[in-house]
Curated annotation (Swiss-Prot):
Belongs to the invertebrate defensin family. Transmembrane segments: none annotated. This is Defense protein 6. It comes from Lonomia obliqua (Moth). Residues 21-32 form a propeptide. Has antibacterial activity. GO terms for cellular component: extracellular region. Disulfide bonds join 44-63, 49-68, 53-70.
Length: 75
């Protein structure tokens, strides 16, 4: 029984070592694409921001305190 446990532990250790070697490549995430829409003075209108960005070929827009940012390219 004891040899069976030692053998099982050995197999788990070997499997873990092999998996660790295969996953040496660093994980990289693609950068989010954000494009500034036309500069608007004053407050940003969310509906207008979305509409302008969709017309330009993006998924939508996000209003910030200063301007509208288009997010996600459809192409």
């Amino acid at each position: 029984m004891k040899t069976c446990l030692v053998f099982a532990f050995f197999l788990v250790a070997v499997f873990a070592a092999v998996q660790a070697e295969e996953n040496d490549s660093p994980q990289t995430l693609p950068r989010r694409l954000t494009v500034r829409a036309a500069q608007s003075f004053g407050r940003c209108n969310q509906k207008q921001c979305d509409a302008d960005c969709v017309k330009k070929g993006y998924f939508g827009g996000l209003c910030t305190l200063t301007s509208c940012f288009c997010t996600g390219s459809r192409s």
